[in-house]
Amino acid sequence: MAAATTYLRTLLVLGRVSNVPTVWSNCFAGWLLAGGGDGGRFLLMAFAATCLYVGGMYLNDAFDASFDLQHRPERPIPSGAIRVEAVWAWGFGWLGLGLACLFGFGQSAIICALLLVVAILVYDAIHKIFALSPLVMAVCRFFLILLAASAGRDGITGLVIWTALALGGYIVGLSFLARKESTLAPASHWPCLFLAVPLMLALIVNQGGYLLRAVVLCTLVGIWMLRCLNFALWSTQRNVGRCVSGLLAGIVLVDLLAAWDGSPLTGSTFAALFGLALLFQRFVPAT
């Protein structure tokens, strides 16, 4: 029983499941911006996206096995908790399951899913050797939003694309900060500019009677960002990992900012996903 529990935790750590609520949040936002639609179709698409995310995370560790052996020996593969061959199999298995779930969603969904998988594999393969790999990570989240929108009633619209680009900006800033997590070098301030992209888009697209709500939400999201950034930039006890974990959970707030229509149900759904992301981080590391 203990061995099974240990192996299950290993699988959860490999899949970085504490970030799965942010995948669900991306899916919910993309689907809402595309006009919503059939709930069953949305749930299947969200499950497929979860499979693609988890598969990508498994393969991330598989690609990094040699690096982790020297620099992160506590990770599941170098610590001996699981064999690298098993991680490769799990990773491609999750990717295959995710793609299989999307075969009935139409051409645009299949194209977005395939492009997402390509971006995932490219990121996993080069992120340790390519200085601009955060851009590739942003591309992954970009196509995730488009994939979710392709399951909606209106499909991929201009607003969906702009929202996906704004989320990509946030991911770029977050990812560049995350690169400082395992180093002693001070974190740079310039990624904060990218974190602000969703705030700027929200203020641009929400005019008239929607502006006040946008300002309030931007203020709340901005406060959370500053709280997280304090751990990396200004605190006397520097903790980049805590900053990055908080910003990862903050992806849900970015989605709320983009897609909330004022509905209590929609708002409470995003709030629940934000709470889940923070809760999951107590048990499984987010990075």
Name what the model sees in each region.
Residues 2-12, 142, 148-287:
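C-terminal membrane-associated helical module and adjoining short loops/tails
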Residues 15, 64, 256:
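Divalent metal-coordination and catalytic microenvironments
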Residues 47-48, 65-120, 135-138, 142-146, ...:
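Multi-pass membrane catalytic core of lipid/isoprenoid biosynthesis enzymes
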Residues 49-86, 174-187, 280, 284-285:
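Acidic (Asp/Glu-rich) catalytic motifs at the cytosolic membrane interface
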Residues 24-63, 95-103, 109-123, 161-173, ...:
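Membrane-embedded alpha-helical segments that form the functional core of polytopic membrane enzymes
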Residues 10-18, 61, 77-87, 104-109, ...:
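Short, amphipathic, aromatic/basic-enriched membrane-interface segments that mark the entry/exit
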Residues 1-28:
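N-terminal, positively charged, Ser/Thr/Ala/Gly-biased leader segments
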Residues 32-33, 104-105, 125-126, 150-151, ...:
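Helix-loop junctions at the membrane-solvent interface of multi-pass transporters
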